[in-house]
């Protein structure tokens, strides 16, 4: 068969066909390029621009991160005794996708964990979910963990966590504080030093397949928290709490506080509250027991405040210890208000005014001092402002500005009314008298260390300001010794030691807003030995009952029962050289408080000859203590060891002079 021949157009047909073909090829190539470009752009977007977003989505779909509590750093007393530690415990988890019979598993787990019916139903609902991980019970005791382990249930596992444990139970509980269920500090040192103690959380990453079946888990290690070393001495703290509990029980008091402090450094050796609580099970106690009354509760101090009225008057030379004061036959009228003494006194020397605690006599002296001078000294002693101690919840008390005083205020303030103070403020102010006149900032933390024992930071003694001259301190001490030797504080006496102190019985405000004739706060604060104080001790009992419930009756003997064991603990020599002091079983290695230097400690000089000792090369603490004992007001610059000092070694010095110590670490530069 012969096909017909198509007509040919030699001149134009090939050219048109080729053009069409070429155009089609170009369009096809362009389409391919555009398609490839879109793919490339999309790939760049997915793999480069949006990579992190899709990685997060993928991880979210295939991984679950479980945060485990970090190991909190320990809290230790000054001698390394453990007050708060973290112990390993087991937590129980389940992988629901690996459990074949969630109903049976829930029933058996509920029996082992002693769950009620409602909790068992909740657990069963959790096990029936299509999830890779659920908590069954966290931080169980060893017996419970073993009971669950004995069930040998598929899909049930264990992970090691840690729990806070307080080995000394109630000891210093208001100071140490406690942690909540999430292992976060809720009060005390646990709260105040949370950032140091908490550490970095451990993470458990669980990986799953497309059906959410676990493929295993990866543990990301935690970082332990830092160690916090307190100024407390466990032995002295134990004595303070034991004797305070006894006194509260014997007197029927509502509550009580006791503080033992080193007056030269401001370090708190004991801080006791009663009633107390066990932080291992803090939920079992009313929240009022968690409160640290020594820093958060203010009260009218009563006659113990006469210490500061007397100190200001003697410093300003408006009275002499042997000057006779007219005590008005037991009363004085101020601004139309009659102020009565607790007894009828007529003419008393000022030292007798203090020994017998005459309100009228103190009012007479305060009137000579004047309101502006009086206010200046009281604020100098720190009243009306927080002490700055590293404890949460501290209040500054109440001292109104003079423009808000009434015509009666100066008289009332002179014997401790119309003012609110905390127990720690009061102890710190008395420490300023005991140490020669310098107000020291009270400290509760000595240092913070890392897990290897390296010091992160420490707390050297800080002199806030000088309040009294040494001569005034000597005169005040003599007055306070008279209180114990022949006045209202006889029961505070300690055999073999000279004690200086003052009693107080402060009326409380009743529901009508008036001073109660029944309820009061009984207190005693003092220092011992009077000539070279090693400790300041404050005790306060809230609303003691019974026929003998004054400060001299109930607080003074409590002072003695706490101070005497503290002196033994610190091996402070007796004022009577014929007495042999029995040591209270000190630990093998301990750091002595500043108020006592053992015989083998480096001495500032062979004798205190009125010359500046050579303090170069010493630690900040050792140098500051040595200088403070010579009556110097110490100013520290820098950190580390002493590299320079002013006055220079060998220069003549006298009490009250300023002393600058420049500190530097090895390889560092001294401050300019």
Indicate where each model-derived feature is located.
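Short, solvent-exposed beta-strand edge segments and adjacent coil->beta transition regions
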Residues: 89-91, 131-133, 223-227, 294-296, ...
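Short flexible coil/turn linkers enriched for glycine and charged/polar residues
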Residues: 169, 199, 301, 531-533, ...
């Amino acid at each position: 068969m012969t096909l017909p021949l198509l007509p040919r157009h030699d001149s134009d047909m090939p050219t048109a066909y080729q053009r069409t073909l070429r155009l089609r090829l170009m369009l096809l190539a362009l389409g391919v390029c555009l398609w490839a470009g879109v793919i490339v752009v999309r790939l760049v977007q997915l793999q480069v621009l949006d990579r992190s977003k899709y990685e997060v989505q993928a991880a979210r779909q295939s991984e679950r991160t479980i945060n485990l509590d970090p190991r909190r750093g320990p809290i230790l007393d000054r001698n390394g005794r453990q007050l708060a530690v973290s112990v390993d415990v087991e937590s129980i988890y389940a992988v629901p996708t690996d459990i074949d019979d969630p109903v049976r598993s829930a029933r058996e787990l509920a029996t082992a964990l002693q769950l009620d019916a409602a909790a068992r139903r909740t657990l069963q609902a959790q096990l029936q979910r299509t999830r890779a991980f659920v908590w069954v019970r966290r931080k169980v005791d060893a017996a419970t963990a073993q009971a669950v382990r004995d069930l040998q249930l598929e899909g049930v596992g264990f992970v090691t966590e840690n729990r806070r444990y307080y080995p000394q139970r109630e000891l210093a509980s208001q100071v140490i504080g406690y942690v909540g269920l999430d292992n976060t500090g809720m009060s005390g040192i646990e709260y105040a030093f949370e950032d140091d103690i908490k550490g970095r959380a451990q993470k458990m990453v669980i990986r799953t397949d497309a059906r959410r079946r676990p493929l295993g888990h990866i543990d990301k290690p935690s970082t332990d928290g830092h160690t916090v070393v307190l100024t407390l001495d466990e032995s002295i703290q134990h004595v303070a709490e034991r004797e305070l509990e006894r006194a509260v029980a014997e007197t029927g008091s509502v509550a009580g506080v006791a503080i033992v402090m080193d007056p030269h450094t401001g370090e708190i050796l004991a801080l006791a509250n009663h009633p107390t609580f066990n932080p291992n099970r803090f939920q079992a106690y009313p929240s009022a027991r968690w409160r640290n009354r020594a820093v958060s509760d203010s009260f009218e101090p009563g006659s113990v405040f006469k210490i500061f009225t007397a100190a200001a008057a003697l410093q300003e030379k408006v009275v002499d210890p042997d000057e006779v004061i007219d005590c008005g036959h037991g009363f004085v009228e101020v601004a139309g208000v009659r102020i009565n003494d607790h007894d009828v006194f007529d003419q008393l020397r000022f030292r007798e005014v203090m020994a017998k605690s005459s309100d009228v006599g103190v009012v007479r002296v305060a009137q000579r001092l004047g309101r502006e001078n009086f206010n200046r000294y009281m604020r100098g002693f720190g009243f009306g402002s927080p002490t700055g101690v590293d404890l949460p919840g501290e209040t500054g008390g109440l001292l109104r500005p003079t423009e808000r005083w009434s015509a009666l205020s100066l008289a009332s303030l002179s014997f401790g009314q119309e003012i609110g103070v905390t127990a720690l403020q009061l102890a710190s102010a008395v420490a300023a008298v005991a140490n020669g006149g310098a107000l020291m900032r009270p400290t509760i933390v000595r240092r913070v260390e890392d897990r290897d024992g390296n010091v992160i930071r420490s707390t050297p003694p800080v002199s806030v300001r000088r309040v009294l001259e040494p001569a005034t301190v000597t005169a005040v001490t003599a007055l306070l010794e008279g209180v114990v030797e022949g006045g209202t504080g006889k029961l505070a006496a300690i055999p073999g030691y000279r004690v200086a102190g003052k009693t107080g019985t402060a009326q409380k405000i009743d529901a009508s807003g008036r001073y109660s004739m029944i309820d009061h706060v009984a207190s005693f604060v003092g220092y011992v030995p009077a000539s070279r104080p090693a400790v300041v001790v404050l005790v306060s009992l809230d609303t003691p009952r019974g026929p003998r419930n004054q400060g001299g009756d109930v607080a003074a003997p409590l002072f003695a029962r706490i101070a005497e064991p503290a002196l033994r603990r610190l091996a402070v020599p007796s004022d009577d050289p014929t007495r042999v002091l029995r040591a209270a079983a000190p630990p093998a290695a301990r750091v002595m408080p500043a108020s006592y230097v053992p015989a083998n400690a480096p001495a500032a000089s062979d004798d205190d000859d009125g010359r500046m000792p050579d303090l170069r090369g010493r630690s900040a603490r050792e140098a500051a203590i040595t200088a403070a004992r010579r009556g110097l007001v110490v100013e520290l610059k820098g950190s580390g060891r002493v590299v320079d000092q002013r006055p220079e070694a060998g220069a003549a010095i006298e009490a009250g002079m300023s002393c600058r110590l420049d500190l530097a670490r090895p390889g560092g530069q001294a401050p300019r």
